[in-house]
Amino acid sequence: MDLAFELELPVIIHCRDAAHEMIEICNDLSNKGKCPKGVLHCWTGTPKEMKQFLDLGFYISFSGIVTFPKAHEIHECAKTVPNDKYLIETDSPFLAPVPNRGKRNEPAFVENVANYMANLRSTELFTIANETSKNAEDLFKFDLLS
């Protein structure tokens, strides 16, 4: 994370069952003025944990898990994450979204994630596509939309 901060590059964090520890690490870096931008890949945390990462400037990325019927806390996160702080992903070849759950995940299945996010957020697929494209541009410093 020090190198990412030094090079002004974003970090991609896969944090599973260790949100408290990761928040502590990021808070320590932030207190030193050295916390890089980044994204919490394949989000599986709680709304409270999400808020803590958002407060540190991180983005939250939702995978096929958001389509799972029993993923209630992730659904709540997907509904409440700010428009300018989320991404979507597939995590291929793992965690295929409904209706492909249990199969090998494919990049094309990101559309299932986007549709599910649109339903959860009571918006259109077009809105999800635009918001996540803009957010990816902002985080990764490239130009998709022009």
Task: Label each residue range with its predicted role.
Residues I25, P97-V98, L139:
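Residues that scaffold the ATP/ADP-binding catalytic core of kinase and kinase-like folds
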Residues T67, T90, T132-S133:
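Ser/Thr-centric signal marking residues that sit
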Residues C15, C42, T67, P99-E106, ...:
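Alpha-helix initiation/capping motif
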Residues M1-L87:
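Catalytic pocket-lining loop regions of alpha/beta-barrel enzymes
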Residues I60, F94, D138:
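Active-site micro-motifs of SAM-dependent methyltransferase domains
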Residues D84-E106, I128:
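Short acidic/histidine-rich active-site segments
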Residues L3, A108-S146:
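Mid-to-C-terminal alpha-helical segments outside catalytic/metal-binding sites
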